[in-house]
């Protein structure tokens, strides 16, 4: 484990890029063989806006990486944060706790807030307005959302006191996890259900992408499912009944245009409606 952390402490940008491309490529190919839905779409055309926003996310994270490194170095050298206040533990436990709480503060918490605060929801709407959710949807985030997510990651590092090796390992696992749980793949139902007791499975996250409440406001986790189960935000829904998108912004053509998506956070707010299935 120490060797792994030492590698991630100095992981080259080229290796992180390779991880991103490899994950996308793997799940892209897998989608063609074990698809959950057979979308009638041009997969490459659909991917263009999603890859554009993936690129903007990469640029923002690259430009602000010095802040992540600076805060991590500061908390580590000053023995500040939860991980530094704990008694000496085996390194694997320390790493696990770091990733667990970074997932809470850096992923679950901002995601939950984006669904509860109207201006944040209008920003996050760009992610939800994809009508054919697949692995390219994973990083379909408006640049403003990328800034929000990055800020919460900084807060997570400050609170946990995680060293940069743990932070980079967390971000790498988070990347693969979000590519996996957005991928248009169909696992055996029992396998998916078992997986969802510990991690965010594809079916679990797809429920979050159903087009109407209350399912849209559920399953906020990214890596671990414990936070949704602990805070009462977990919901299950039949994957065969899923409809992607958002009920009040259902113009599929507009939701596939980069220029429209960039302006989407500044559109008038429309109150979502509830799904009749939630009453069953």
Enumerate the predicted regions with their spans.
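Short, strongly hydrophobic alpha-helical membrane anchors
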Residues: 1-13
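Membrane-water interface of alpha-helical transmembrane segments
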Residues: 10, 14, 43-46, 161, ...
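Loop-to-helix transition at the N-terminal end of transmembrane alpha-helices
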Residues: 15-19, 42-55
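Hydrophobic core of alpha-helical transmembrane segments in multi-pass integral membrane proteins
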Residues: 19-29
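A membrane-cytosol interface segment of integral membrane proteins
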Residues: 242-280
């Amino acid at each position: 484990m120490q060797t792994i952390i030492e590698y991630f402490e100095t992981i080259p940008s080229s290796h992180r890029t390779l991880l991103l491309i490899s994950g996308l490529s793997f799940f892209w190919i897998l989608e063609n063989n074990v698809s959950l839905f057979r979308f009638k779409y041009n997969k490459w055309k659909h991917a263009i806006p999603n890859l554009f926003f993936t690129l903007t996310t990469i640029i923002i994270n690259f430009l602000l990486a010095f802040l992540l490194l600076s805060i991590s170095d500061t908390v580590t050298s000053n023995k500040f944060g939860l991980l530094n206040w704990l008694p000496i533990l085996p390194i694997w436990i320390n790493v696990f706790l770091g990733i667990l709480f970074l997932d809470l503060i850096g992923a679950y918490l901002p995601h939950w807030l984006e669904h509860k605060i109207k201006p944040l929801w209008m920003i996050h709407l760009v992610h939800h307005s994809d009508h054919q959710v697949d692995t390219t949807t994973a990083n379909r985030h408006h640049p403003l959302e990328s800034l929000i997510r990055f800020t919460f990651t900084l807060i997570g590092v400050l609170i946990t006191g995680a060293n940069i090796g743990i932070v980079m390992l967390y971000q790498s696992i988070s990347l693969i996890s979000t590519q996996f749980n957005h991928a248009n793949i169909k696992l055996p139902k029992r396998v998916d259900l078992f997986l969802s007791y510990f991690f965010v499975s594809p079916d679990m996250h797809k429920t979050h992408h159903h087009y109407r409440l209350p399912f849209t406001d559920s399953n906020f986790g990214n890596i671990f499912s414990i936070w949704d189960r602990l805070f009462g935000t977990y919901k299950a829904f039949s994957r065969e009944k899923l409809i992607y998108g958002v009920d009040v912004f259902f113009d599929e053509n507009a939701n596939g245009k980069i220029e429209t998506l960039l302006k989407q956070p500044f559109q008038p707010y429309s109150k979502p409606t509830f799904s009749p299935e939630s009453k069953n």
